[in-house]
Amino acid sequence: MPTIKQLIRNTRQPIRNVTKSPALGGCPQRRGTCTRVYTITPKKPNSALRKVARVRLTSGFEITAYIPGIGHNSQEHSVVLVRGGRVKDLPGVRYHIVRGTLDAVGVKDRQQGRSKYGVKKPK
């Protein structure tokens, strides 16, 4: 326990909470340009080729973002919208690309959970 004198000298500092998506700078989403689109393999025990993109954000950060859904049209120089949200089995991937906005088209023939993949209601 600190003495009264110690508390007068320097006050108690509040515990600062560290953000899990620092590149967004407190914003819900950020726009960016793809610099590289490639696939990586997940951690054990999973096995797949997960599609990711290296994105240069308007905030100046260069991040790795996951491309959700089946099939995508993202390539180098594509302008994409990035949101927070990590991918548990891909170390270092802490962002998702928002499908159905800017240059990232929605997932083709998606019937359920459409809002998460940028798909309009079928007629």
UniProtKB/Swiss-Prot annotation:
Subcellular location field: Plastid, Chloroplast
GO biological process, one term: translation
InterPro entries: NA-bd_OB-fold, Ribosomal_uS12, Ribosomal_uS12_bac
Any one GO cellular component localisation term in the record: chloroplast
Disulfide-bond pairs as recorded: none
GO molecular function, one term: rRNA binding
Origin superkingdom: Eukaryota
CDD domains named in the record: Ribosomal_S12
Pfam families hit by this protein: Ribosom_S12_S23
Keywords: Chloroplast, Plastid, Ribonucleoprotein, Ribosomal protein, RNA-binding, rRNA-binding
Family, similarity comment: Belongs to the universal ribosomal protein uS12 family.
Quaternary assembly: Part of the 30S ribosomal subunit.
HAMAP family named among the record's database cross-references: Ribosomal_uS12_B
UniProt function note: With S4 and S5 plays an important role in translational accuracy. Located at the interface of the 30S and 50S subunits.
Name by which UniProt lists this protein: Small ribosomal subunit protein uS12cz/uS12cy
